């Protein structure tokens, strides 16, 4: 399980098939990965590590898009499938599958501007056995920074 939380964000329709959920990198308040039981570990995940993990391996999110739930501060929920992730120096953008993107609390989708959005990402990637892969992806993404030590819990 991954949890990505920001202080603000937006939903934009980008075509017949997709929406995008975007927020400024500066608005990111938490990005956390949890392992499955029995290990029950958790890790802070810097944006560059999340981006590196997106395409890493045969079971990557790029190869098998994850299910997700997006919640805004009013408690409304939207179920979606994440089909893309782009992180640059300014923003984090997830691509949402249109057919899966729907609100379960009302007839309308979440509003265009979101306050305190939280994205819950379902993942079989982060099992106890997958921790080594997480650390490898983190090491590659963080080679030039100190965030690798954070992945190790230092």
Which ranges hold each PLM region?
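Acidic, glycine-rich low-complexity segments with interspersed aromatic residues
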Residues: 1-74
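A generic structural motif
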Residues: 21-23, 90-99
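Exposed beta-strand and adjacent loop surfaces of beta-rich binding modules
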Residues: 65-67, 79, 116-118
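Short beta-strand-centered aromatic/proline hotspots
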Residues: 77-86
